[in-house]
Every structure is written in structure tokens, then in C-alpha cells.
Amino acid sequence: MKIIAGLGNPGQKYDKTKHNTGFMTMDHYLDKKGLTLNKDKFEGHWTKEKINGEDVIFLEPQTYMNESGRSVSQIANFFKVAPEDVLIIQDDMDMPIGKIRIRANGKSGGHNGIKSIIRDLGTEKFNRLKIGIRHPKNATVVSWVLTPFNDEQQKLMDDAFDTSVDIIDDFIAGRDSQYLMNKYN
């Protein structure tokens, strides 16, 4: 069994903001596959599907970004999913807009959602699909991450969302993190 979790903040106010890149990526994947998050439990919206013979849980925590670990750990513990079988989709301010990087483990890089997941899973050994949102040039971090992408930026993000569909499919198919990093980084 696998868990794919997209990080973001709940509520329409945050819907299309940069910090909701994880939610937007997840929504893009689910739309492409004709799936919906139809359950509310574990402090998140989620669904469990069978894809190519593999049980997969898709999750969008509803705890706000900084407490995402509560939702991820609750569902992982309930379904007894090992951290190595978890893929977290997150935004990354240290990468250019739309740039993708796969990581198999590691520190949070200052991302509070990832800090929370490391704390609540008790390990850094879970997979991340990081999508760049760039560091703000002339804005505070908070105002940057809580604003939508402009049209030019959105085109780059749309390409990243399309590539993410392939990455998620490869993860579900059992491709290991080294394969994913070699192919997509």
C-alpha cells in the first residue's frame, strides 16, 4: 500500500496560492485519473483506490500546513503504511518556479509541513516530490506563498503538474526513489 499526500492549507482563501502547490498537484492527478477525495477522516480529505493492483491512499491534510504530520501519521498508522511507501507533494521556495526534484529522505529544508511530518512519523525517511515556487524577490515570504501564480508562472506550474502525473504513476508502480531521482531530477 502507498500513500500520496499533497500539502496545502484548507479553505477557499488559500485555494490557488503558491503554498497550496501540493493540493493543486494532487487535484491535477485526481482529475486526470477521474478520482475524487470522498472521505473525511484522519484530519484530511482522502480516498483509497486500487491502481494497477496496488492499494493507494490519496490524502490532502486539512490541518493547515504546519500540522500536516498529524494527518499523514494518523492515516499511515491506521493502514500500517511504512514511511518508505509515503510520497509527500510539497512546494519548495529554494527552487525555480515549476522545477521538480525528488528526494528519498532528508531534513525539512525549513518547510514547516515537512518538519511536522518528520516529527509525527518519527523519521526523515519518506519520499518527497518537491515543486519549486521560487523565493520572493521583493516580498515577504508569507505574502509570497499566500498569493496565486501569475499567468507566466502558471504555465510553468501546469507543466510541472503534468510531469507529476508520471512521477506519481511511477511511484505507485513501485519504482524506487533512485529510479525516480535519475529520471526526473
Swiss-Prot record:
PROSITE patterns linked to this entry: PEPT_TRNA_HYDROL_1
Binding, tRNA: 14, 64, 66, 112
Gene that encodes the chain: pth
NCBIfam families for the chain: pth
Name this polypeptide is given: Peptidyl-tRNA hydrolase
GO terms of biological process kind: protein quality control for misfolded or incompletely synthesized proteins; rescue of stalled ribosome
Keywords carried by this UniProt record: Cytoplasm, Hydrolase, RNA-binding, tRNA-binding
Family label: Belongs to the PTH family.
SUPFAM superfamilies, alphabetized: Peptidyl-tRNA hydrolase-like (SSF53178)
Entry-linked Pfam families: Pept_tRNA_hydro
Quaternary structure, from the entry: Monomer.
Gene Ontology molecular function: any one: peptidyl-tRNA hydrolase activity
Reaction(s) catalysed by this chain's protein: an N-acyl-L-alpha-aminoacyl-tRNA + H2O = an N-acyl-L-amino acid + a tRNA + H(+)
Active-site residues from the entry: 19 (proton acceptor)
Gene Ontology terms: cellular component: cytoplasm
